[in-house]
Amino acid sequence: MLSFRIPRHTFPRLLQYALAVTPLFLAAAIVNTQSPPADSSSHSSSTAPPCIAFTFDDLPAHGPLPAGETRAEIATKILAALRDARVPPTYGFVNGATLESEPQDLPVLQAWRAAGNPLGSHTWSHMNLDQNSLEDFEANVTRNEPLLSKMMDNEDWHWFRFPYLAEGYAPAKHDGIRTFLAQHGYKIAGVTMSFADYLWNDSYGRCKAKGDNAAIAQLQSSYLAAADANIGFYRRLSHALYDRDIPYVLLMHIGAFDAEMLPRLLDLYRSRGFQFITLPEAERDPFYRNDIDPHLSSNPNTLEAAMAHRKLPLPPQPVPPAPLDTLCR
């Protein structure tokens, strides 16, 4: 990362590339990074626990649907885990186009709202800004609005998450979409913690279909290990930059394996000292000011980009230890 303008989607794509071409390296890539750097002296880190807002993309459906399960059942598992862990209202980001081909999945959105959780926009069809014109992307965002307005009634649905975290690599497109979002009252849902949870859902579907419980146990272990390692990775970046923990926003997906693992994942974050907060609470922090008001410059819009801007060395990001693409094939 050599420039100041670094699109958010760079890191998931690099992670997928590494996963595909270096499976032997990946097995040794996760390191114990759960503690902040030793030279951190911020009083805030010693007096206040780290906070995190969970968010879920791709509602109402993400990834393969294992045999015998429904999308509504996946959502029910996720909602139950959030409720049992006393997680405050949690934004789910919607692709309305899914309901055209799978109208039976509308209960997912209804259950999300009935549980007191808000919805935001993920575009109508999960459109990639970098692969489409600005005009087509804007129309795709607008097309999602009637569904969100209906589902949210008088509550705030003007939160937007870029599909693929692609915010427009070309400066004109990048600036153009931020102007559009600002003019239409949107706030951008940032991402300051992720462990590429979506990578496990395909493998889980295959392994469950084969009844390979040993492989599923491997997936469970590597999923939690990746989450734990990335807790340390992002906390180190925050402490290197600001000598404190910013309130983190975690990117998740409404996948079958995510639903299976969410109770244990929430336990992991709590065991690491995290308190759960809402997305609006997290983005009150000054770090997110350019996402709350997209009229402002978006740089830096991630912890990685902030590190690059400050010319601070970026440690290797942990990546999953298992060859997920080939498991249970």
Cite the ranges covered by each PLM segment.
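Signal peptide processing junction and immediate N-terminal pro/mature segment
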Residues: A28-S41
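N-terminal secretory signal peptides that target proteins for export/translocation
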Residues: M1-P12
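C-terminal domain-boundary segment and adjacent tail
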Residues: D84-R86, E100, G190, R244, ...
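Bacterial N-terminal signal peptides
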Residues: Y17-A29
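Short, basic, helix/turn surface patches
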Residues: P118-S121, L147-M152, D212-G232, P300-L327
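A short acidic, amphipathic alpha-helical/loop segment
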Residues: P107-V108, G176-I177, R264-L265
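Alpha-helical scaffold elements lining the catalytic groove of polysaccharide deacetylases
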Residues: P66-A67, S101, M127-M151, A170-H184, ...
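Active-site beta->alpha N-cap acidic-glycine motif
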Residues: S42-L165, L250-L251, L268
